[in-house]
Every structure is written in C-alpha cells, then in structure tokens.
Amino acid sequence: MAGSGVRQATSTASTFVKPIFSRDMNEAKRRVRELYRAWYREVPNTVHQFQLDITVKMGRDKVREMFMKNAHVTDPRVVDLLVIKGKIELEETIKVWKQRTHVMRFFHETEAPRPKDFLSKFYVGHDP
C-alpha cells in the first residue's frame, strides 16, 4: 500500500522538476549572454594580470570556443548549472585564486576528437 503511494509521489515529482534559476530557455539564454559578456570584458585584465603569452584576441576567441562547445544544450537546468560553473571560474580568475598555469590550461591546443571506427583507431594507434 505505502509502496504504491511512494511510487506515485516520485513519478509526480520527477515530471515537475523546478529549474535552478531560469524559468524558461529565454531566461537561461539571457544568463548565458551576461556571463559571456563578463568573460569577454575580463579577458584583457586577465591577460595583463597573469602576464599570459597570448593576445587579447586569442583569449576572446578561446572564450567563444568554450561557450560554443556547449551551444547544443537545450535543458534550462543544465544551462543554469553550466552558468553557475562559469561564474565560479570567472570569480576565481578575477580574484586571482588561480595561478598562471591554471589559466593557461584553457589555451592548450584544441583536442581532436578521438577516432570511432576501427581503421581510424588503428592508424592513430589506439586500441580497438
């Protein structure tokens, strides 16, 4: 008896999950744009403060690349989670809680996707 009530309550709760911050996708997109603008404005300060061996343009291009990596996400809760993580990274960078090496990890060469078929794995040297 009690088991069916619990099952019904969990099934009802799982269908109506409240988003973290954004009520809909438009609000989530607005939060992403705000975060992008904050990172875009912070790049010149970061390059100067950490004395990075990159230009401001390269830094801004990397910021764009990092944001475009998650452009396919459509769930507002996941977008909110990514925005929260981005804000934490931004705060750590602004307050110099990171060291130069932590910041430069973002600027390693973009990794090529791993091969998926047998011949590509064989040519690269990965195990099948």
Swiss-Prot record:
It is found in: Mitochondrion inner membrane. The modification Phosphoserine is found at residue 11. The keyword Phosphoprotein applies. Keywords: Disease variant, Electron transport, Membrane, Mitochondrion, Mitochondrion inner membrane, Phosphoprotein, Primary mitochondrial disease, Respiratory chain, Transport. GO terms for cellular component: mitochondrial inner membrane; mitochondrial membrane; mitochondrion; respiratory chain complex I. Accessory subunit of the mitochondrial membrane respiratory chain NADH dehydrogenase (Complex I), that is believed to be not involved in catalysis. Required for proper complex I assembly. Complex I functions in the transfer of electrons from NADH to the respiratory chain. The immediate electron acceptor for the enzyme is believed to be ubiquinone. PANTHER family: NADH DEHYDROGENASE [UBIQUINONE] 1 ALPHA SUBCOMPLEX SUBUNIT 6, NADH-UBIQUINONE OXIDOREDUCTASE B14 SUBUNIT. Belongs to the complex I LYR family. This is NADH dehydrogenase [ubiquinone] 1 alpha subcomplex subunit 6. The lineage of its organism: Eukaryota, Metazoa, Chordata, Craniata, Vertebrata.
